[in-house]
């Protein structure tokens, strides 16, 4: 997987590339695509996928209302390997765990880290992306926060149920302003509803590169060893085997690198 240097190169190029849609263009109004009937990978030819599409360039809506991004292309490639078509349903981040637990979807792919807490209720795929660092953003005219320790006693906005929210609590934030969608954390900051945002580096760079730099700035980062995984029902051992087997093939046959280059304009190696 990619190291931090490659990630920084990735983000710098992606920011300059001007991907399809700014964060502000994604919102709560995203309607779920038609849900498919219950399925098993490789048998019913349909893989029901859940996600939260306000996380460009990983998963978002383009100007035509289509769900696109690195993760959408990746899960389609994985589904192809197991002989299935993707049926996507958009939902808030906070509903991911119940969706896989109650088998409303077969898998969730949406910048989710494989934490110990989540492992109690869901199964994971192998890691498909290492995120590198968390970013702390404040309004451009705010000079009170310069480091992670400065979040003590402050109001911090983060997506509900995310590791970003957990980090805000760990750093001593006085109040967490929860958001259902990634796009809303930046709206909360801009509206003065929070003193700072904690988010993943890719989303922070995308936001700043699509107009956010006029309103906010990055003041600190916090290292992270977390990686993004695909969630699925804990009891569905075959699904986990199928997904991991397909993901391995996609990573070995060059498709993963092609998709990575498509969305970040750089190879996995950073070249």
Annotate the PLM regions.
Residues 1-46, 268-271:
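Short, low-complexity disordered leader/linker segments with a strong preference
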Residues 27, 72-81, 142, 155, ...:
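Extended ligand-binding regions for polar small-molecule ligands
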Residues 28-34, 163-176, 180, 215-220, ...:
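Ligand-binding clefts/hinges and TM-proximal coupling segments of bilobed small-molecule sensing domains
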Residues 34-112:
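Extracytoplasmic small-molecule ligand-binding "clamshell" domains
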Residues 53, 130-138, 201, 205-247, ...:
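Periplasmic-binding protein-like
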Residues 53-54, 67-77, 133-184, 201-205, ...:
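Bilobed "Venus flytrap"/periplasmic-binding protein-like clamshell domains
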Residues 72, 88-100, 143, 161-162, ...:
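Short helix-initiation/N-cap motifs at beta->coil->alpha
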Residues 76, 80, 85-150, 221-222:
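Acidic, polar ligand-binding/catalytic clefts
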